[in-house]
Regions:
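Sec-dependent N-terminal signal peptides
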Residues: 1-27
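Intrinsically disordered, low-complexity terminal regions enriched in Ser/Thr/Pro/Gly
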Residues: 29-206
Length: 206
C-alpha cells in the first residue's frame, strides 16, 4: 500500500537504523507537545528463596530461560517510544527530546524499544529476531497524507535470545505545511503474527 494524497511538494525521506543487539505518553492536549511523566512500572523482585545466596551462572541461565519464555508469551509492545535529540548508539542510550514541536524541515528522530518479539532458530545453535515496519502520516483531520507498507525491515542473529534490541527511526518531511500531524509506525514480528502500533503526534511550527 502506498499513499500520496497531498498536492503540494512533499518529499519524504525515510531511513531507519536498528541496532546493535546489545508510546509516547499521551499529553493533556494531544497536539500541545507537553508530556506527562510516564508512570514507572512497578517491578516486584523475585522471592529471595528462589535465588541462591550466591547464584551460579547456571542459576542465572535458568532465570534468563524463564524470562525468554515469558517474553515470547508477551504481546508485541514498546517499552519505550519517543522523539529523541540524536540517534542512540547503544540499547538504552536515548536522549529524550522532551517536545513534539518541530521546525519546518527538521527531521523526526524516534527511539523504539520493542518487547515480546520472537526468535527463529538458525542452524543448530543460533536465533534470529526480525521486525518489519509500516508507516502512515496523517493530518489532524485523520486523513492519510503518505504511507508505505514494509518500508523497513530489521533482523539480528545471535547465539542467545537477544532482548537488547532497539530501533532508531529517522523521518525527514520537506514541504510539509505548518500544522498538527500524527506519525504512525506499525511493527510486525517476523517470527510470529504479533503486531503493535506506535502513534507519535507532532506539530510543525509556522
Amino acid at each position: 500500500m502506498q499513499h500520496t494524497t497531498k498536492c503540494a511538494l512533499l518529499a519524504i525521506l525515510l531511513c531507519a537504523g536498528a541496532v546493535r543487539p546489545g508510546a509516547v505518553a499521551a499529553a493533556d492536549d494531544f497536539w500541545s507537545g507537553a508530556k506527562k511523566p510516564e508512570p514507572k512500572a512497578r517491578v516486584t523482585p523475585l522471592e529471595s528463596a528462589t535465588i541462591p545466596a550466591v547464584p551460579t551462572v547456571r542459576d542465572i541461565d535458568a532465570l534468563l530461560a524463564a524470562v525468554s519464555d515469558a517474553w515470547e508469551r508477551t504481546p508485541l509492545t514498546m517499552r519505550r517510544a519517543m522523539f529523541v535529540k540524536t540517534k542512540a548508539a547503544i540499547f538504552g542510550g536515548y536522549d529524550d527530546r522532551g517536545s513534539n514541536v518541530f521546525a519546518p524541515g527538521e527531521p523526526l528522530l524516534s527511539y523504539l524499544e520493542p518487547v515480546g518479539y520472537g526468535w527463529k532458530p538458525v542452524g543448530s545453535d543460533s536465533f534470529q529476531l526480525g521486525l518489519t515496519i509500516d508507516f502512515l502520516l496523517k493530518g489532524s483531520d485523520g486523513k492519510v497524507i503518505a504511507g508505505q507498507d514494509a518500508f523497513q525491515s530489521f533482523s539480528a542473529t545471535s547465539h542467545v535470545k537477544n532482548k537488547e534490541f532497539y530501533l532508531n527511526m529517522t523521518m525527514s518531511l520537506n514541504g510539509l505545511d505548518p500544522g498538527s500531524y500524527v506519525l504512525i509506525y506499525t511493527v510486525h514480528d517476523n517470527a510470529s503474527s504479533k503486531v503493535t502500533t506506535v502513534e507519535q503526534p507532532f506539530t510543525i511550527k509556522g
